[in-house]
């Protein structure tokens, strides 16, 4: 039974990722006044299937000087971690109802850094290594603010369980009292998932393609899937933390529909940002975090510690 549940989560996520790639190409196309993919199937709807067949039937080439074991483990682990991060998300009921689900997600997103680092190192290519080091520095840096923002929100929530966020937001979205945190969170998720304007890991002008420069075919597709699964997961998490959908246990389907529509809108917003903004310079990226976001989030964290005590007494102990 558990295996069926697991498959019922993995298959839709992979399908969502496949069609997100199509949506991205369509959105970018229309924003640049062109059609995007429109040959394979009606309106190009079968393009993701064609892409998958093409990538997985290609020969998985490996550089002679690479470390073969790590070279294959890195993309596999990247996708495994990306899919595992979905398990504690309440939609409206999580696959694994953990007491520390928020910490679990943070820990897994930190582990995802290793896959990038290993792939860059195992490729034995200078470009890949520089791209990987950039990615690691960026991801680790932005995780600091993500953790502090999560801590601030959990002080209002009273526990590390994501399921209780729906109860917390029954009357008001947390977006409204803590909108500065929401803005910083959204920008940090962009940086955490290596999306434009923070896609410095894939700086074509200086690094050819970033940490996955030596990958082709299947392993490259696994990295691609992991990246997009992370994007949708981060947006789902944003919805759970800031725009909690109303959950009525009589009709849980309503929660799912509400949650899915909001996640889709945020994902489309990610694509819109990619089409609109140029890439940051690396020092600007780090400056934004360490000099702007970190002091602000620390102050906001202190504010969220003080606020419940000032207004109501000690925070809820659930």
From Swiss-Prot:
- Entry's transmembrane regions: 3-23, 69-89, 102-122, 144-164, 171-191, 222-242, 253-273, 294-314
Q: Which GO terms describe its cellular component?
A: mitochondrial inner membrane
Task: Name the chemical reaction catalysed here.
Answer: a ubiquinone + NADH + 5 H(+)(in) = a ubiquinol + NAD(+) + 4 H(+)(out)
EC number(s) on file: 7.1.1.2
Instruction: Write down the membrane topology.
Output: Multi-pass membrane protein
Cell compartments where the protein resides: Mitochondrion inner membrane
Main subcellular localisation: mitochondrion
State the UniProt keywords alphabetically. Answer: Electron transport, Membrane, Mitochondrion, Mitochondrion inner membrane, NAD, Respiratory chain, Translocase, Transmembrane, Transmembrane helix, Transport, Ubiquinone
Q: Is the Calcium keyword given for this protein? A: no
The source's superkingdom equals Eukaryota
Any one Gene Ontology molecular-function term assigned to this protein's record: NADH dehydrogenase (ubiquinone) activity
> What are the BP-aspect GO terms?
mitochondrial electron transport, NADH to ubiquinone; mitochondrial respiratory chain complex I assembly
* Oligomer and partners: Core subunit of respiratory chain NADH dehydrogenase (Complex I) which is composed of 45 different subunits.
The UniProt entry's sequence similarity note says:
Belongs to the complex I subunit 1 family.
Which function does this protein serve?
A: Core subunit of the mitochondrial membrane respiratory chain NADH dehydrogenase (Complex I) which catalyzes electron transfer from NADH through the respiratory chain, using ubiquinone as an electron acceptor. Essential for the catalytic activity and assembly of complex I.
UniProt-recorded name of the protein: NADH-ubiquinone oxidoreductase chain 1
The organism encoding this protein is Murina suilla (Brown tube-nosed bat)
Upper lineage is: Eukaryota, Metazoa, Chordata, Craniata, Vertebrata
| Gene responsible for this protein | MT-ND1
């Amino acid at each position: 039974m558990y295996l069926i549940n697991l498959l019922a989560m993995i298959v839709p996520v992979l399908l969502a990722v496949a069609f997100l790639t199509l949506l991205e190409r369509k959105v970018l196309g229309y924003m640049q006044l062109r059609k995007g993919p429109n040959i394979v199937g009606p309106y190009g709807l079968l393009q993701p299937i064609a892409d998958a067949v093409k990538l997985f039937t290609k020969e998985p080439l490996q550089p002679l000087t690479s470390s073969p074991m790590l070279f294959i483990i890195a993309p596999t682990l990247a996708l495994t971690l990306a899919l595992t991060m979905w398990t504690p998300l309440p939609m409206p009921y999580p696959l694994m109802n953990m007491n520390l689900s928020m910490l679990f997600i943070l820990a897994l997103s930190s582990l995802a850094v290793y896959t990038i680092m290993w792939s860059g190192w195992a490729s034995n290519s200078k470009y890949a290594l520089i791209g990987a080091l950039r990615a690691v520095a960026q991801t680790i840096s932005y995780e600091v603010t993500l953790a502090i923002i999560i801590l601030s929100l959990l002080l209002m929530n009273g526990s590390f369980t994501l399921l209780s966020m729906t109860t917390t937001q029954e009357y008001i979205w947390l977006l409204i009292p803590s909108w500065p945190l929401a803005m910083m969170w959204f920008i940090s998720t962009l940086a955490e998932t290596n999306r434009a304007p923070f896609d410095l890991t894939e700086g074509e002008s200086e690094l050819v393609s970033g940490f996955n420069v030596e990958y082709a075919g299947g392993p490259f597709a696994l990295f691609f899937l992991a990246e997009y699964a992370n994007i949708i997961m981060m947006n789902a998490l944003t919805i759970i933390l800031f725009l909690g959908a109303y959950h009525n246990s009589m009709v849980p389907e309503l929660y799912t529909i509400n949650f899915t529509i909001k996640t889709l809108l945020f994902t489309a917003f990610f694509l819109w940002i990619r089409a609109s903004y140029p890439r940051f310079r690396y020092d600007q990226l780090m400056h934004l975090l360490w000099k702007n976001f970190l002091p602000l989030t620390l102050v906001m964290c202190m504010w969220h510690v003080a606020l419940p005590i000032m207004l109501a007494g000690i925070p809820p102990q659930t």
